[in-house]
Each structure stands twice: as structure tokens, then as C-alpha cells.
């Protein structure tokens, strides 16, 4: 990937990986330039989302970013608070987070996941006005889903290691419970309007950057 190709990806929107009735909808801050250039979430080489997802027990093996479409088969999905790609999350304005929070609430209400997991507590605080929020389960619900704030897996987040993040993600998994048997179902991303072939777990009802 050349620097020119990365720069050309600025402000690009990456389609969600979603389905109705997910166990967990993971929500990043916004796409990195690498994610926008490849179309694969959490694609930056320094991002630890995929190894943490595996080590915590959400997936039986470590998926590659290019294998993201397998996630709905495990009852998992990915979206973002802010849709547009930037080189760093600090390029985003507070109002973008608040507007993204409103879009996310509507999206969650439409898709009906059991849990919304925001990977970045600072983004969660800004988007939803929860200034005192801490890592872990939250008291509020969003769009009918329970909420868990997770540490940002970006390599720039030096406060958390892969091991300590995996422990926190495993706490969420314990709260979510085991996966059901998935069945195929195509769905359309409410955010970007792009179709992704996904699946719906039949155990549920209803339908930083540096990522």
C-alpha cells in the first residue's frame, strides 16, 4: 500500500459487517486509512482487535481482516461511531461523535443486537454524553441493546496489552453467553447502503483510528 493510496482513502466510508439479531455488534471509533483503502475493518498492522477477539474466545481461530465477513456466522458484527476515515481519531470533531452516536442508536434499534460493544471508552463518552463512563458494562441501553465499553485495540493505546484486553473482552463474552447455530441471511448496511452477505444467529430474535 503506497502513501498515495492511503491518502486517497481519507474520508472514505467502509461498509459495516452486520446482520439482524447479532450477539455483539462491535463499534470502532472510525476507520483508519488502511481500513478505508482495503475495505477491511481493523486492518492496520498495529491494531490488536483480531488477535484479542480470538484470545478472548469470540472466534475459534484468529481471523484475518480480509475474513471479516465470517463474523456474522459467530453472531458478531462491526460498525463505527463515525463513518469517515482519517489517519488519526483526534482529527474528528466532538460534534461528529455526537452525530455518529445518533446514527448508531438508530442502527442498533434496526438491527437488534443483544450487546453493543464500543471499542474506545473516550469515543463512547463523547458520542453519548456519558462523561463518567468507564471500561465495562454500562447502565444504559442504546437502541434496546445492552452496552459494554471496551478498551481501544489500537497499537497507540499503550495502557492495555493483548492479554489484558483479551481478559476484558472475555468478560463481555461471559455476559453474552454461547453462540447459537447461524443460518445465512443477506442484509444491507443501514449506514453506507452497501450490501454485505452475512448470516443471522437463530438464537436471537429480530432482524482509532489506527484501525
Please describe what each predicted stretch is.
Residues 35-38, 125-129, 159-160:
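Short glycine-/acidic-enriched loop or helix-start segments at secondary-structure transitions
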Residues 35-95:
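Short, surface-exposed acidic-centric catalytic microdomains
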Residues 1-15, 19-20, 45, 88-101, ...:
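C-terminal capping/extension of enzyme domains
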Residues 18, 23-29:
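Short, hydrophobic/glycine-enriched beta-strand segments
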Residues 25-27, 119, 150:
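Short hydrophobic segments within beta-strands
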Residues 73-132:
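Internal catalytic-core helix/loop-beta-alpha segment
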Residues 13-19, 62-71, 107:
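Short amphipathic alpha-helices and their capping/turn segments at secondary-structure boundaries
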Residues 30-34, 83-86, 122-124, 153-156:
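Short, solvent-exposed loop/turn segments at secondary-structure junctions
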Amino acid at each position: 500500500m503506497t502513501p498515495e493510496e492511503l491518502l486517497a482513502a481519507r474520508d472514505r466510508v467502509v461498509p459495516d459487517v452486520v446482520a439482524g439479531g447479532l450477539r455483539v455488534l462491535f463499534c470502532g471509533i472510525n476507520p483508519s486509512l488502511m481500513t478505508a483503502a482495503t475495505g477491511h475493518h481493523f486492518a492496520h498492522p498495529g491494531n490488536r482487535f483480531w488477535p484479542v477477539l480470538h484470545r478472548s474466545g469470540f472466534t475459534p481461530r484468529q481471523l484475518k481482516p480480509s475474513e471479516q465477513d465470517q463474523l456474522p456466522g459467530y453472531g458478531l458484527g462491526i460498525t463505527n461511531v463515525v463513518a469517515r476515515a482519517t489517519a488519526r481519531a483526534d482529527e474528528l470533531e466532538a460534534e461528529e461523535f455526537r452525530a455518529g452516536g445518533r446514527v448508531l442508536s438508530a442502527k442498533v434499534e434496526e438491527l437488534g443486537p443483544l450487546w453493543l460493544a464500543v471499542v474506545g471508552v473516550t469515543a463512547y463518552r463523547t458520542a453519548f454524553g456519558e462523561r463518567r463512563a468507564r471500561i465495562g458494562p454500562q447502565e444504559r441501553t442504546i437502541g434496546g441493546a445492552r452496552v459494554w465499553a471496551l478498551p481501544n485495540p489500537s497499537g497507540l493505546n499503550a495502557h492495555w496489552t493483548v492479554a489484558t484486553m483479551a481478559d476484558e473482552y472475555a468478560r463481555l463474552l461471559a455476559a453474552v453467553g454461547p453462540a447459537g447455530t447461524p443460518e445465512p441471511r443477506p442484509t444491507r448496511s443501514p449506514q453506507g447502503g452497501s450490501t454485505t452477505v452475512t448470516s443471522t444467529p437463530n438464537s436471537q430474535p429480530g432482524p482509532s483510528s489506527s484501525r
